[in-house]
Design a protein with these regions (language model features):
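Recognition helix of helix-turn-helix/homeodomain-like DNA-binding domains
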Residues: 35-49
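DNA major-groove recognition helix of helix-turn-helix/homeodomain DNA-binding modules
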Residues: 54-66
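Alpha-helix N-cap/N′ positions at the starts of helices
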Residues: 11-12, 36
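N-terminal flexible/basic segments that precede or flank functional cores
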Residues: 1-11, 46, 61
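Helix-turn-helix/winged-helix DNA-binding modules
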Residues: 22, 48-51
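Short basic helix-loop element that most often maps to the first helix and adjoining turn
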Residues: 14-31, 58
Length: 66
């Protein structure tokens, strides 16, 4: 059975930014906690598609979104 999954990437990124700020993490602090570089986190928050799925999941899991 084929499953179509649609992801609102922009909405997910905006929610991640909101959670980071609500938890009072700087980008640098969240990057360390998630195990990614600050430039990677910055790319994620800017919605750039060059980030790997693995790194996106690290960030989302750290924020409780995955």
């Amino acid at each position: 059975m084929e499953r179509n999954i649609r992801l609102d990437w922009e909405g997910l990124v905006q929610e991640a930014i909101k959670r980071r700020k609500d938890q009072k993490f700087t980008q640098e602090e969240l990057a360390v906690l998630a195990g990614v570089s600050k430039p990677t986190l910055n790319s994620f928050e800017q919605g750039k598609t060059t980030i790997t799925l693995a790194n996106a999941l690290k960030i989302l899991r750290t924020l409780g979104l995955a």
